[in-house]
Amino acid sequence: LKSLTVLAESPVESRELLTELGVEKVIVEGKTAARVTQGDSDKPKQVPPNQEGKEEAPVATAAQPKEPAEQPDAKEGPAEGQQPGGVDNAAEASPAAVSPSRPQPAESEVGNSSPGEKGSDAPSTEARGMELEGKEEEGEAMVEDEEEAKIPKAAQPKSESKENAEDNESGSTDSGQENSGETRLLRSGTYSDRTESKAYAAVTHKCEDCGKEFTHTGNFKRHIRIHTGEKPFSCRECNKAFSDPAACKAHEKTHSPLKPYGCEECGKSYRLISLLNLHKKRHTGEAKYRCDDCGKLFTTSGNLKRHQLVHSGEKPYQCDYCGRSFSDPTSKMRHLETHDTDKEHKCPHCDKKFNQVGNLKAHLKIHIADGPLKCRECGNEFTTSGNLKRHLRIHSGEKPYVCVHCQRQFADPGALQAHVPIHTGEKPCQCLICGKAFTQASSLIAHVRHDTGEKPYVCERCGKRFVQSSQLANHIRHHDNIRPHKCTVCNKAFVNVGDLSKHIIIHTGEKPFLCDKCGRGFNRVDNLRSHVKTVHQGKAGMKILEPEDGSELNIVTVASDDMVTLATEALAATAVTQLTVVPVAAAVTADETEALKAEITKAVKQVQEADPNTQILYACDSCGEKFLDATSLAQHVRIHTAQALVMFQADTDFYQQYGAAAATWQTEQVIPATELLFRPRDSPQEAPAAPLAPVPLAGEGQAPAE
C-alpha cells in the first residue's frame, strides 16, 4: 500500500514497481489510451447512455480528486497521462493536460472542491490498493477490468457490438451507430443476413399430408388449408369463402363494374393491374411463349400449356353427370351449371333465376336505366362488354369467325364451335339410356328431359312448362311483348335474334337447311324435319316402287335433242334399263322454279296420255336422287343448277309394242354399276333405235310414237 501511495512521485520508479507487481500492461495501455484520447480531444465525443445499470461516469469523476492529492506540486503534466487513475480525466482535462508547456491548474483550484470530495481521497486510494492486490491474485482478470474502466467508449468496439446486439434483440436501434452490412445474431440462432448464411434456407416447414416443403410460414399455412378445406376469408358481397386472402380480394373486385386500369395502346380496361400488365406484354412483344403448332404467343407458360391441349385433343377434366370432357377446369365449372336446376336466386324484374347470387347481381345490370353497356341501335343492355360486342355484330353484319371446313362465317365464336362438329362428326355427349349422341351438352339435356317428360321451367303467368331455361326466357318476352330485334328490310320485330335470322332468309332467298337424302333446301329447320318425315320415311302417300315377281324396273323416258345426260352410281344401282332427259334450262334460279315445274309436268302428261297406268318416278341427272313429284325435283335442281331427269315406269303392254327392238335399245343404253357417263352440252346426242323414237314434249301437238 505504501508503494502505491507514492506511485506518482517518480514515473521511472512507478513503472519498475508496477512491473514487479505484474501490471505493466496497464501502464503501457494507459499511455496508449491517453494518446488516443488526446488525439481525439478536438472531436465531439459520443457518450452513449448508461445501459444495464453500469455507472461508468462516476468512476471517472471519483478519480479526479486523486491527481491533486497525489501530486501536490502539479508540475509534471506528462506524468498525469501515465497514472492509472487519471486516464479518463485526461480526455476531459484542460489544455494544460494536453500540452506540458502550459501550467496546470493551481492548487487553490483543487481546494475549491467540496470537503466531501477531499475526504474521499484516502478511501479511494485504499480501495485502489485492495483492488490491485485482488487483481494480482486473479491475474489477467484485473487487466480486463482496468481496460473497461480506462479505455474510452470510442475505443471499445467489442462492448458496443454486444450492447447493440442486445438492443436489436429487443427491437430498438442505436441512433449513434448503424449496423448495415453486419450480420446480426437473432434469438432463434439463425442469422439475419440471408445472402451470407445458409441457416435461413435450412429452416423449412414440411406438410405431413403430401410432403411438400416451404420456407415461409405464411405459404405453409395457406397450403395446409388445401388439405383441411378451411376457408376463413369470405366475400363481403356474396359471402363466397376463400382459403387465400388475395383470392378473396380479387373476387370482391368482380362485383364492381369499374375497370380503372386501361391500356394506353388499345384502350382495353381491366379490374386488376396484374391483368393489365399481362395484356401489355402483347404490345411490347414480351409474350415469349409460342405455340409450335399455330404460332400463337402467350405471356405465361401456364396459358401456353392450356392452349396446347386444344391441339393435342387432351381433355382431362370430365363431367361426372354426362361424361363430357374438357381441356380446362374453367370450362368444366361452367358446364356443371347446366346440370344444376336448383336456381333459388330470382330476378325481381324478369323472373329469371340463377344458381349463384353473383350471377344474379351481374344480370341485374341489364335492368339499370341508361346503363354503360347499352346498344345504341336497339337499346338492348348487357352485363359485359364482350356480350355487347357480339351483339353489335348483328347490326353490322360482321362475321369474323370462319369455318375451316366449309368457309361459313359466324359472328360468335360459340356458334362456330357448335358448328364444327357437323364436319368432324364428333358427338361427345351420349345418352346413357338410348345411346344417342349429341354435339352439345344442352342438346343431350333436352333429349333426356324429353324422354323422361321432365319440364322443370314453368311460366308463372300462364303455367306453361319448358324443357330449357332459354325457352322459358323467350316465352316470357312474348308476354311482355319485348321485341328488340327488328328486320332492316320490312321493319318487322322479333323476340330473339334466332327468329330474326330465320325471317331474313325470306328476303335473301337463301335455303341453308339441306336434306341429306335428296338435297332439297329449306329456309327453316322445322320445314326440313317435316320433309324428312313425310318424304323419306314412307309417309304422306309416298309411292315406293318395287319390282313384281323379282323382275327389274323398266323405265321409259321423255327425250330432247339438245340436252345433257349425266348418269351416276346412284342411278346405275337402281337397275335402270333406259334413260334420257327432259329439256330444262342450264341454270335454274328461284324465279324459274315454277317454269321448270311446268315443263316437267307437261312431259309427264304426255307419257300419261299414252299409258294412264304408268307409274312415275323423278330423278336428278346430277346426283341421281329420286323424287315423287315435280315440285320436289324442281326445288332440288336449284342446288346443282343443271338439268332435270324424269324417269317413268311403264307397264308390260308398253314394251310389248316394241318387241325385240326394245331389247336392242336396252342393251345399248344400260349403264353398268360404278360407271359415270358424261356428255358435253354441245355434242350431238345419239338417236335411239327407230322403233324407240323419242316421245316429243307435250304441247307440240304430237302423239306418242307407236
Swiss-Prot record:
A single GO cellular-component term on record: nucleoplasm
Any one Pfam family match given in the protein's UniProt record, by short name: zf-C2H2_11
- Keyword Nucleotide-binding, does the record have it? no
Keyword annotations of the record? DNA-binding, Metal-binding, Nucleus, Repeat, Transcription, Transcription regulation, Zinc, Zinc-finger
Keyword Transcription regulation among record annotations: yes
Which residues lie in Polar residues bias regions? 170-182
One of the protein's GO biological processes? negative regulation of transcription by RNA polymerase II
Zinc finger (C2H2-type) boundaries? 205-227, 233-255, 261-283, 289-311, 317-339, 345-367, 373-395, 401-423, 427-450, 457-479, 485-507, 513-536, 618-640
Q: What are the boundaries of the region Disordered?
A: 32-194, 680-706
Give the transmembrane region(s): none
- Residue ranges with Acidic residues bias: 134-148
Q: Low complexity composition bias: which ranges?
A: 90-106, 687-698
Picking any one GO molecular function of the record gives: DNA-binding transcription repressor activity, RNA polymerase II-specific
Basic and acidic residues: bias regions:
67-78
Which compartments does it reside in?
Answer: Nucleus
The protein's role, per its UniProt record:
Transcription factor that can function as an activator or repressor depending on its binding partners, and by targeting negative regulators of cell cycle progression. Plays a critical role in early lymphocyte development, where it is essential to prevent apoptosis in lymphoid precursors, allowing them to survive in response to IL7 and undergo proper lineage commitment. Has been shown to bind to the promoters of adenovirus major late protein and cyclin D1 and activate transcription. Required for early embryonic development during gastrulation. Represses RB1 transcription.
- Tell me the protein family, please: Belongs to the krueppel C2H2-type zinc-finger protein family.
Q: What is this protein called?
A: Zinc finger and BTB domain-containing protein 17
The species this protein was found in: Gallus gallus (Chicken)
UniProt lineage: Eukaryota, Metazoa, Chordata, Craniata, Vertebrata
